[in-house]
Amino acid sequence: GYDWLYDSLQPDTRRVVREAIIAKGFDAAKNTRHAWFYTAKNNWNSVCNSGLAYGALALFEEIPEVSKGIIEKCMETNPKAMVGYGPDGGYPEGFGYWGYGTSFQVMLIAALESAFGTDNGLSQAPGFMESARFMQYMTAPGGDCFCFSDSPVEAECNMMMFWFAGKAKDLSLLWIERQYLDRP
């Protein structure tokens, strides 16, 4: 929201937010004790890289070289997380963590496409787009999910499915989401 609200923020508020993004995001990611997520092949990679990329995009006009470095590191390391979707869209962390980790992956891809006109092929990683169909297959007729890993039984609407449907131009990806939205 920093860049969206920039013109409405007081200068002191801008400074506090900018310094927090740098200290709690960029600087922390330089510390090897905290930066293990760069080599992770799971949702931690997507979640952390997404947050850093959003911070870099928000501060790009103010600190372009630092922001560029953050985005380049993201593009270098985020493909490791994409391996989990291959080869055919099955996801190793179950229904719940697909929703969590993939939501950050989708936000990252959408932000890169919005800012730069490309996601540098992230959405084309083997199995990534197919994983939306995997989520439909993970849903039982009664509306709960087949759970494994540490996923709960309760299924819920995954808002990123709307992104997948738009990207794939396939509204059939939304049929189960409608059922979730129609629940009392």
Regions found by a protein language model. Give the residues of each.
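Carbohydrate-active enzyme catalytic cores, enriched for enzymes
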Residues: Y97-P184
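Active-site lining segments of carbohydrate-active enzymes
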Residues: G1-G96, M107
